[in-house]
Amino acid sequence: MHVTSVVVRGMLFTCMMGCSLLAQRSRRYSDAPDPERATQDWLDQCRDSNNRNGDDRERFCEVREKRLDPSRGLDIDGRQNGGVSVHGWDRPQVLVLAKIQADGEDVDEARDIASQIEIQTADGRVRAEGPSTRRHQSWAVSYEVWAPQQTDLHLVTQNGGISVQNIDGRLELTAVNGGIALNGVSGDVHGQTTNGPLNVELDGGRWRGNGLDLQTTNGPVNLSLPDGYSAHLETGTVNGGMRIDFPITLQGNIGRRIATDLGDGGPTIRAITTNGPVNIRRR
């Protein structure tokens, strides 16, 4: 196990008229961040965020590296304070960077808190267990993960976002206070958040798999898709505007929800919100 650590201080509705799969995959993999660079960037960010609000506590930042067998899929729980980000890559293993942040009244106390945090990874279930804390103490663990493109994911967060890039599989995504961001995903994808945006960027000519079903209670829907993309699109909002920057043919009543076939139709792409705008653009 590789460990890197550092101690630091203290409804308007508008419709405006108007390469190969291998190449796409190659581009996808090149888009994934380098793990070593991601580690250093996070440590720098952890250091820079300390004492910005007059907090005189000391902070200990540490990144622990875990390597897992991808055959069981991944089940990651961010617990109370931690986001989860997953990138698809072309290697036959899973790499997990557990980003640990511990705060205490002095450096030794912060380091001691971090030393009591255990990252559990049995059977592909990733969890952090740590000590109880008192006033002026806290700890949090977030995860950045690299996995084979064909990987099933079950991701849960309470106070943190979920981001998935270039993964094809069965995805179950649940957040409470945090957004869901998807880029180049495919398969059978379901996700929901209570407080946070839905940001989705699709690629290719059509959805590969059973479909996409996302919803948020409080947050916008932002969907970007390539020119000529084919799918059955469903979207809507209760309290918010809706904007689509290309012409569509609506099915059923025009109200707070719309349904339409894009191109030749296909699997359903559904993204809805209760309180927030909907923005769909073609690129």
Residues covered by each model-derived region:
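Short beta-strand/loop motifs in extracellular/secreted proteins, especially
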Residues: 82, 94, 151, 231
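Right-handed parallel beta-helix
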Residues: 60-71, 75, 85-87, 112-174, ...
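Short aromatic-acidic-glycine turn motif
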Residues: 96-97, 102-109, 240-245
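Short acidic/polar N-terminal linker immediately downstream of export determinants
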Residues: 5-10, 21-87, 91-93, 101-105, ...
